Amino acid sequence: MNTDQQKVSEIFQSSKEKLQGDAKVVSDAFKKMASQDKDGKTTDADESEKHNYQEQYNKLKGAGHKKE
């Protein structure tokens, strides 16, 4: 593999790792929001609220994949 290809491969791998880290942060944030009410107290959110957060997460996740 020549040096240009190696550099591109290293940049791609670095970007991929960063995106995976960003996706985990977003996923964790949506999970946290789904489990809290407006006062920040843990609550048993009904399924429709949880579904809404999951739907938003899926849209964001899908938008990230479209850029590749």
Curated annotation (Swiss-Prot):
- Segments of skewed composition (Polar residues): 1-14
Q: Does the keyword Membrane apply?
A: no
Q: Where is this region: Inhibitory domain?
A: 1-32
- GO biological process terms held by the UniProt record: negative regulation of endopeptidase activity; protein catabolic process in the vacuole
Disordered: annotated segments: 1-21, 33-68
Q: Does the keyword Acetylation apply?
A: yes
Which family, according to UniProt? Belongs to the protease inhibitor I34 family.
Q: Which organism is it from?
A: Saccharomyces cerevisiae (strain ATCC 204508 / S288c) (Baker's yeast)
Which Pfam families does this chain map to? Inhibitor_I34
Biased region (Basic and acidic residues) positions are 33-53
Q: Which GO terms describe its cellular component?
A: cytoplasm; nucleus; protein-containing complex; vacuole
| GO molecular function list | aspartic-type endopeptidase inhibitor activity; endopeptidase inhibitor activity; protease binding
Q: Which UniProt keywords apply?
A: Acetylation, Aspartic protease inhibitor, Protease inhibitor
The record ties this protein, via InterPro entries, to: IA3_dom_sf (IPR008956), Pai3 (IPR019507)
Job of this protein: Specific and potent inhibitor for yeast aspartic protease A (yscA). The proteinase acts as a folding template stabilizing the helical conformation in the inhibitor, which results in the potent and specific blockage of the proteolytic activity.
The protein's name is Protease A inhibitor 3
Query: Which residues carry the post-translational modification N-acetylmethionine, per the record?
Result: 1
Per the record, the gene is PAI3
